Design a protein with these regions (language model features):
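Phosphate-binding and adjacent anionic-ligand microenvironments
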Residues: 3-172
Length: 172
């Protein structure tokens, strides 16, 4: 009750190209922590209808409150039918950026706000020529540090991810 389209909620792992596509179409975009629960909470906080995450879970608050795969598939099919599009054509509407994800196993808690990590991020932003996004986070479910880089230039994103990984391994 009281929800409106308003905008779209993704997660910290949602591809930057999707966020940019939303902005180009004047659709507000917000990021939540990874997980349906956090997407749902952000939707509730903003009173927005639509959110989702990379797993394919799509939440539409006026229809359902969970990221059910069958419901998500039916929603995609409904969109295709209403807009008279093939799945192939719909998928060409957005060109996602290459996204590099490296998982670093660790039994130790890593200070991701350390000067070493901050400097490595700054150097990685230079490697990526200021284009793209860098995310370093501890896994919520496994003993891992996740390093994610993405941007229009795959080579730079890969180089930056490898560089960050080496710097983090130095402080583990």
């Amino acid at each position: 009750e009281g929800y409106e389209f308003g905008g779209v909620v993704g997660t910290h792992m949602t591809n930057l190209a999707f966020e940019e596509k939303c902005k180009m179409q004047s659709i507000p975009f917000a990021r939540a922590n990874v997980g349906d629960r956090y997407v749902s909470e952000e939707l509730d906080r903003r009173k927005w209808l639509i959110g989702g995450e990379n797993s394919g879970h799509i939440l539409v608050k006026n229809l359902h409150s969970t990221g059910d795969g069958i419901i998500s598939a039916l929603q995609v099919l409904s969109y295709l039918v209403k807009n008279k599009k093939s799945l192939k054509n719909a998928l060409t509407e957005i060109q996602l950026y290459p996204q590099i994800l490296i998982n670093i196993p660790t039994e130790n808690k890593v200070n991701l706000k350390s000067k070493t990590v901050k400097n490595a991020i700054m150097e990685s932003e230079i490697i990526m020529k200021g284009k793209g996004r860098i995310l370093i986070r501890a896994s919520g479910t496994q003993p891992l540090v996740r390093v994610m880089t993405e941007g229009p230039l795959r080579k730079e994103a890969l180089t930056a991810a490898k560089f960050l990984t080496e710097k983090i391994k130095e402080i583990i």
